[in-house]
Amino acid sequence: MTDPDSDADRPTMAPFVGALAIIALVVIAIVLFNVFGDDEPPAGQQVGRAAVGQNDALQRQNFADFRTYTCRAQQGVEADVLARQRDSVAKRGERFVDDVTDIKVDGDRATAKVTYHFDKAPDAKTGVGMTFVREDGAWKVCSTGPS
């Protein structure tokens, strides 16, 4: 005969199988989100990156990077762009982007207020209305900032 108490003491695997199923569902959900989720940042964030990237390229006098963040209509000639940048640095110091606000996106065009300051007058903030366009799949600055 079997002892009735021995069957009651035997552990069951149901809680472990249930926990394993929940963990598997969570892992599957994470994988699906990573595969099908949107990796591209919002357009407003891309506009801000374009403003900062263009300014950084100018400060480093890197015309190739400047072109990456500038629309074709505003790219100009390398010698002229870099000469204006050197002149601006000599007069006002390096230019820094403090903020990009009031971003408004309308299809492949956008506007934003970009706030700058210069090294020689760090407390004098200059807010400039800038325009941006989406060219070749990327947002690019399509107006000139203060120099």
Residue ranges with predicted function:
Residues 70-72, 141-145:
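Sequence contexts marking disulfide-bonded cysteines in secreted/extracellular proteins
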Residues 47, 95-97, 141:
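A broad structural signal for short, well-ordered beta-strand segments within beta-sheet-rich domains
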Residues 125-139:
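A short, surface-exposed beta-strand/turn
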Residues 3-4, 41-42, 83-129, 145-147:
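Surface-exposed, charged secondary-structure patches
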Residues 2-59:
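Short, low-complexity N-terminal intrinsically disordered segments enriched in polar/charged residues
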Residues 50, 57-77:
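Short, well-ordered alpha-helical segments enriched in acidic and aromatic residues
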Residues 36, 73-86:
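Alpha-helical membrane-embedding segments
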